[in-house]
Amino acid sequence: ENTKENAKNLHKRKILLIFACRIKHRQMETYKYQAEINALIQQGLKMPEVVKPNDLKGFRFVFSTDMSKSYLPNYIMKPQRAIMNGQRKVDIGGYALSCFTEKDKAIKFYQLLAKNMRNIYKAIGDGISSGIVTNNDGNITIPARNGHYNLFEFPLCDLSKTFKLEEDKL
């Protein structure tokens, strides 16, 4: 009888241990691209300060002809950009989704980029989508004066389901 009781207790402890490990692992895997972010942190980069979005309106550049890649971070679309070299500054924000607080600020930023990069539409898109960024979507950097902020997505975030196309040709 005593060995049965010990076996039951051992089984309960194993289950609790597995559960505790899963909780700890989930806390470490905060963001959708946490493994990639961790790799950059190990190279000495710092995670920016982030806050809750609290249902902030978001505007994002999109590819009007290919929405599937419109909600992927820069470094996921082009992984070679995340490799540190002397040419380019690597930033953890490359694993976040770039958004703006206002449509006119997004358009102004796009026009500024277009002056220096003729084919900007190939890199970041040719349209604008908008939606509400909720606390369930992830955390954001504090919006800059130009309205830009980065959304570090939680694993279940999918803006393609909540954002709608506003402008299909910039």
Regions found by a protein language model. Give the residues of each.
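Short, Lys/Arg-enriched N-terminal segments with co-localized hydrophobic residues
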Residues: E1-Q27
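ADP-ribose/NAD+-binding catalytic cleft of ART/PARP-like enzymes
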Residues: F19, Q27-D91, L170
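Polar/charged alpha-helical tracts
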Residues: R26-Q27, A35-Q43, D104, Q111, ...
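ADP-ribosyltransferase catalytic core
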Residues: M47, I83-D158
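Charged phosphate-binding loop/patch that engages nucleotide di/tri-phosphates or the phosphate backbone
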Residues: F152-L170
